[in-house]
Structures are given as C-alpha cells and as structure tokens.
Amino acid sequence: VGGYHICPRDQHGLTGPCAPSHDKGKDKMRKFLTGITTAAMLMGSAAYAETTLKLVEVITSPERTKVLQGIVDGYEAANPDVTVEIISLPWGQAFEKLATMVAGGDIPDVVEMPDTWQALYAGSGQLASLTDHVADWEHGATLTEKTVAMGSQAGDLYMIPYGFYLRAMFYNKNLLAEAGVEPPETMADFMAASAAVSELEGKSGYCLRGGPGGTNGWVMMAAAMNGTNDFFTDDGKSRMNEPGSVEGIQFMLDLYQKGYAPKDAVSWGFNEIVAGFYSGTCAFLDQDPDALIAISERMPAEDFAVIPMPVGPSGKAFPTIGFAGWSIFKATAHEDKAFDLVAALSAPEANGTWAKRVGVIPVHKGADQDPYFQTEQFEGWFKELNGEQYEPTTMPTYLEKWGYFASTVVLETSQEALLGQRSAQDLADEWAEFLTDEHAKWQAKQ
C-alpha cells in the first residue's frame, strides 16, 4: 500500500514478523520510526525521574551521613520520580559555605537548619512556612508542643526539629546511696546532696565545668534562682545582675569554694567532666544526651540515671536546649515534593532511628514508649520536655558578640571568681553590662 507492504497476521490476528525488505525507502522509514520510539522511551524515562531535590546537611559526620542516606534511600524507593542529591558540608565551614551557595543562587531545596541559624534565614524571609504542610501531614499532630514552639519564629513554623540536645542531671546511684541522700528535685536539695557526697573520702558532689564550654551552667543556675530565662527586660537591660541571678552565680561559686566540686574542675571542659562522672570522682553531671555514649560504655546502666535539672525557688528550672531540624528554602521550585522529603525524614520511625544513632531526644509524642527510651537514663529528658515546670532556655545567639562572650568573657571572668578573686555581684555586673550593650547594638539594626 503506497509502496509499503503489510505483513500477514498470525493466528491471533496480530501482525507477524516480516521478511527483510531490500526497499531502501522502507529501511529509511524503519530507522526513522525506531529513532522516534527510542526518543519517546528516553523522554518517558526522564519524565519519570523528573525532579531532583538538593538536600544540604551541615552537622556532618560519617555516622550521620550514613543514617541520612539510609532514610533518603527509602524515600527514593517510594518516590521513583524524585532523586535526592545530598551535599555534606563540614560543620566548621558550613555557615560560610551555605551562605555562599545561597548568595550565588545555588539554593538547596531542603537544608539541615541549626537553631542558631534559624532566626537569620527565617527572619530574612528565605524559608518556606511549613505551618500548612504540617497541618495536613498525617504525623503533624504527634509533634510535641515544644517541638513546634522551637521550630517556629513569629508564629510561623519554619523548621521541623529532628531532636534536642537538652541539659539534664546525671547522678551516680552508688555515691548517693553511700552518702544517704535522694536524687535532688530542688536547688536546695542539690546543694545539700553535693555537700553530703563530698564528705565521702576522695569524692565530690558536682562535676563543675569551669573551663571551656561552661557558659550553660552559669546561665541555668542564674535563671533557676531568678525564676526566669528571659535574658533581657522589655527595655533591653540584661537580667544577669538582677538579685536572683546573682544568687545563682553565687550558688555555682559556693559549689566550688565549699569543696563540693573537684579542685581541678576550675579548668574542666567536656571530656573532663564526663570522665569525672564515669570514673566515680563526682556524683552529679549536667549534660546532653550525647554524653550517654561515652558514659554508657564505661558505667553499668544500673549504676546511674538521669533526672530533670533541679528547680529554683519559683518552682521552675530552665535547662539549656540546642536543636537542629529540616527547613525548606522558599526559592525551591518543588515545595510540595521538598516537604514530602522533610516528612519522610521527620516521620516517627525515621526520627526514632535518627535520635538513637545521633544522640538526641526524639520529637514525637509517645517516643518515650519505645523500649530503647524507656530507661532511667532517658527519663529526665522526657520529663523536661513534657513538664510545665521546665522551660527550655535558648541562648541569644542573635547577638553579634555572643560567641565571644560565651567562649572568652565568661570563661576568663568566671575562673577568676571561682578562685576567689572576684565576687558574684562583680561578675554579674560585668556580664550584664556587656550583654546590655550588645543587645542595644542588635536592636539598632532591627
């Protein structure tokens, strides 16, 4: 027909194979049709994997990347039309590298967002609101209230936190039993228990962090005794030298100067306080869940437990909290698919896996019912997350010189005070003056 022959049908009525034709026109047409078919198949395949999402992780380690890749692999298997490209930035350079990417237009769809960066990116309008997405998400209602509060800025949700680094109190059961005291619930109990343990030969009550990274301890004690974790008054003045805060600073000085902490603790950092606890040198240690890794390797589980931070005269405690989570950049061309990825990363099962492997407290209601978390070692953190008398404290990292204050000013001046060279009031006044000035500079830029 028209220069082309029709092949005979087989017994099923289908066109059967034809003998090769020596007609050049037919060969050209066959090649043409084959080319069209191949192109169509390739186009169809491309359309099937049509979306690539760029995910940037910033708190990078081999273990974290391995866990993240495993969750992403499961997401890709369930969503064959989406490919996820993971970009791992080393933590020490992550802030600058992400800022450079964003400024250059190489903006990721999904980003691991530390708490200290959230105000910067959300405040400048660069993050997509997740409020409506979470409202429609099957697991949205199981996020704890503190999780939603921590991921929000100005009433909008810009991050789904994946876990918390929350400060709570480790205690050595054997030392408390030997000293004849119960786990402390109040600041007064804590001082009395520390004194009792310190009566034991070669033992101290508290693993005080007088060296690098000790700012959290001073802030928590000051807040507990002052009854508030607000850093500033409405008119911008630091609360650090209010009478209650001065009492909290004096509380820390008393622990050391009365001999309820080891003498060497004036220079102890993270490794030293953790070692001081698992070696049985001191009975109390305030730390985050990631300290469990080293402690659990060296102490039997039945020898220690974790309780909430002791409450002050107001009946409240203000444990410091750190967290990170998943955010979506507003510039993404695939917001719905990006949220599907965030939802997969944040689902209860995935979040539970992440929390166990990374060393954070999970974010969903009922997570404490997982047998892994139903231990005395995790009890204190879940009580803090679920109890109204515990208000997590976030540092004012929006202040330009907060890093300098925490790492240098507090370190140097508090060591002088611990050694008896300065008073609590003197310390509080210097800190308050510094913070009030920094707050004024920040306020002027708003």
Tell where the protein language model's regions lie, with residue ranges:
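Glycine-centered hinge/linker elements that transmit conformational signals in sensory
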Residues: 194-196, 237-265
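Short, well-ordered beta-strand elements
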Residues: 50-62, 82-87, 109-110, 158, ...
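Extracytoplasmic "Venus flytrap"/periplasmic binding protein-like
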Residues: 70, 74-143, 152, 174, ...
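Short, solvent-exposed loop/beta-turn-alpha elements that line the ligand-binding surface or hinge
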Residues: 128-143, 210-213, 227-247, 296-299, ...
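Extracytoplasmic "Venus flytrap"
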Residues: 53-70, 89, 165, 213-214, ...
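C-terminal lobe and pocket-closing loops
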Residues: 119, 288-301, 312-412, 440-446
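Conserved C-terminal helix/tail region of periplasmic/extracytoplasmic solute-binding proteins
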Residues: 52, 83, 177, 391-446
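Hinge/lid segment of periplasmic solute-binding proteins
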Residues: 115-168, 182, 191, 199, ...
